[in-house]
């Protein structure tokens, strides 16, 4: 927004370019009111087959000394988005942001959301490639997106609680939960969609007991179950179940980006060594301690397959 960059032409039709370029090749600040700009946008949207709504934060809203008390998109933008959806035309939300936002309303009402952060001078070309289907996206989130600002801090590698909520439960009295929202994020760490789908088989381990000077191999079958070729980021997480110091419920220990043709399956392998299990203890010694570990492989930090092994 406000850039001289335009999405590259998908046709050499000069008439198409004249129709598509409604306000010149760049946008500038002016004195029009929000109501005037809203009406102008709706007038243009009525002529479109598909609406691409570029909304979110400006770059000045992120970074040092740029805190916010709300993580919703600005009110005037949500008003515009609601009006665009009322047209009945397909709407794609292209989201510019420098931080996780609360997008529960958008998730429930907008058919497609493309999070683009703050791209550089070539970002428009990449966005255009994804929107037009020239590229099958395979990116994954490096931050957790909450449902509500009240859930913050919210991150995947948190410590366990002494009163955990039972799996599958939304609320239990005197457990670690909220009265008005469940504990889960809107989009977990490592989340990301594609124009195809992938299926993970169960994890197999070549051994379930590993000595301090040994290793083990974890394998999983990954299948592209969709109709398009695509890439998947296979993520490896490990949990130290009992340690001298409290350990996170899971930690990212590795990942592989795997390209599969439609219908193709492949065996994905991770080598596990004691070095992957080490942490700094109270004496600041970098150690791996004997005990049980959960090994998780999946598409993001919440949707994983699990196997258990013992280090001795």
Regions of interest found by a model, annotated:
Residues 273-312:
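Terminal connector regions
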Residues 3, 12-29, 96-231, 237, ...:
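Secreted, periplasmic, or luminal enzymes acting at the cell surface/secretory milieu
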Residues 1-7:
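Short, small-residue-biased leader/transition segments that mark boundaries at the very start
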Residues 215-217, 265-269, 304-306:
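Intrinsic-disorder/low-complexity, polar/charged segments enriched in Ser/Thr/Lys/Arg/Asp/Glu/Gln
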Residues 227-244, 250-252:
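Short acidic, flexible loop segments centered on an aromatic residue
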């Amino acid at each position: 927004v406000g850039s001289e960059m335009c999405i590259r032409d998908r046709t050499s039709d000069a008439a198409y370019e004249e129709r598509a370029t409604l306000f010149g090749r760049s946008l500038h600040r002016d004195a029009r009111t929000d109501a005037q700009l809203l009406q102008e946008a709706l007038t243009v949207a009525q002529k479109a087959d598909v609406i691409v709504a570029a909304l979110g934060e400006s770059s000045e809203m992120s970074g040092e000394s740029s805190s916010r008390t709300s993580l919703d998109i600005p009110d005037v933008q949500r008003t515009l988005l609601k009006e665009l959806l009322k047209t009945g035309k397909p709407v794609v939300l292209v989201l510019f942001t420098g931080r996780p936002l609360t997008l529960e309303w958008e998730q429930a009402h907008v058919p497609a959301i493309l999070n683009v952060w703050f791209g550089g001078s070539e970002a428009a070309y990449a966005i255009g490639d994804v929107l037009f289907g020239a590229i099958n996206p395979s990116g994954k989130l490096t931050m957790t997106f909450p449902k509500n600002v009240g859930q913050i801090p919210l991150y995947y590698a948190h410590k366990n609680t002494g009163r955990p909520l039972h799996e599958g439960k939304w609320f239990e009295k005197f457990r670690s939960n909220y009265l008005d929202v469940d504990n889960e994020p809107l989009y977990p760490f490592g989340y990301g969609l594609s124009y195809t789908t992938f299926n993970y088989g169960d994890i197999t381990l070549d051994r379930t007991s590993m000595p301090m000077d040994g290793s083990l191999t974890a394998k999983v079958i990954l299948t592209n179950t969709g109709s398009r070729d695509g890439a998947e980021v296979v993520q490896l997480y490990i949990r130290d179940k009992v340690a001298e110091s409290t350990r996170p419920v899971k930690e990212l220990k590795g990942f592989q980006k795997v390209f599969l043709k439609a219908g193709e399956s492949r065996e994905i392998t991770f080598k596990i060594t004691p070095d992957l299990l080490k942490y700094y203890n109270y004496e600041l010694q970098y150690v791996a301690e004997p005990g049980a570990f959960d090994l998780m492989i999946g598409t993001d930090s919440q949707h994983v397959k699990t196997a258990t092994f013992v280090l001795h």
